[in-house]
């Protein structure tokens, strides 16, 4: 006789499936958008590249790839918001000592979107074909890089709050309606959150790829568990 693993949540399990779909959609659309925007024209320069390299990169980007990539990234951010809202509800446990952590999860995830919606990551590229002054191009590119780095702070807070909420929730009495998240998901989130804060202090450094890739793999794992969860019952599967 075996039992089915469930997610620790005060919301009905079936309500987490849209959040799981949103997590997958956000990951696919954001990565596809970034790849489309950065893969055309001259190679994407480093954070500390000279102005001439940045100017050539912006001037050689394909306008269609830029438009489609920007569309995918915008809708990917919307899907991310749906995932964040679902996750904040999923880690909330009424009566837990750290019940407020779900609010930090929601606010931190929303702050990451707010930073990206400033448009700094795309505004300079839209004018690249019109010819940019090298200094203006460098300023726009640097603004994009700093915007990305500031997003790491919000994602770091998101990871720390989510990991803490998962681990704190496991210490509360369980029930058939609120089965537990696995502890390793909580520790994974804590490690990624701390990693984001470390690489922000080390900016500019390509070490940011490590927590960033681990973070999005974590998002896919959590999203998959949301999709697989079933409404908890007292019965067991034989």
Residue ranges, per PLM feature:
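Hydrophobic, aromatic-enriched alpha-helical segments typical of multi-pass transmembrane helices
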Residues: 2-238
